[in-house]
Design a protein with these regions (language model features):
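Glycosyltransferase catalytic domains, chiefly GT-A lineage
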Residues: 1-203
Length: 203
């Protein structure tokens, strides 16, 4: 990995998650994986976003605004970073294990390819059984994504997309490029343009 490029951890914790925030920060600092650690809180929203979230959460509590803060804060950090810097987003409930340094470096090496700007993780069948202890259900995109959203992006009948294992938004790596900026803007914009595509209303 290019030593001139920063590795930045991004997370968000609402005001009722202070215990988790402290644990997460401690693990992140102890791991020494990151050049910067940015854990955002409710008072880090700008006025526009704060008003939007307040409006949503009056009636719909899921995900503190249906997780709109994920693309919001990741995009914010990318825009403030240099091209080539890597953001690792992780939910505040994730655990950062310092002993996994080799695996972490493997992820960074994948992103060292100039053609790779996103490293997400999928619920693949390979992960159904872990040490014969944990069993995971099949989680395909079509089971958990609204059909109206598929239709909006013109992929409702594309089985190569809708029948694949769903990508997990709880942790991912994203490198600052023009493509990643466009991707994050698209993710954020859909909340403002068509909120009905991401909420729990019927599709």
């Amino acid at each position: 990995m290019n030593k001139n490029k920063k590795i930045i951890l991004v997370a968000f914790g609402s005001n009722n998650l202070n215990k988790s925030i402290k644990r997460f920060l401690f693990q992140a600092e102890q791991s020494k994986f990151y050049d910067q650690i940015k854990i955002f809180k409710e008072n880090d929203f700008d006025q526009k976003m704060n008003n939007f979230i307040l409006k949503i959460t009056k009636e719909k509590k899921r995900g503190f605004g249906y997780w709109i803060w994920k693309p919001y804060f990741v995009l914010k950090v990318l825009e403030e970073s240099n091209f080539g810097d890597i953001v690792n987003y992780a939910d505040i409930g994730c655990h950062i294990i310092g002993e996994n340094k080799k695996r972490f470096n493997d992820y960074l090496n994948i992103l060292n390819d100039e053609n790779v700007w996103l490293l997400p993780f999928q619920y693949k069948e390979d992960y159904k059984i872990l040490n014969n202890k944990y069993h995971y259900p099949r989680i395909e995109e079509y089971k958990f994504t609204k059909s109206d959203l598929f239709e909006y992006y013109d992929c409702l009948n594309n089985k190569e997309i809708i029948n694949t294992p769903q990508f997990w938004a709880g942790s991912f790596f994203i490198k600052k490029t023009e493509n990643s900026l466009y991707f994050m803007k698209q993710w954020l914009d859909i909340f403002f343009k068509r909120f009905d595509l991401v909420d729990d209303t019927n599709s």
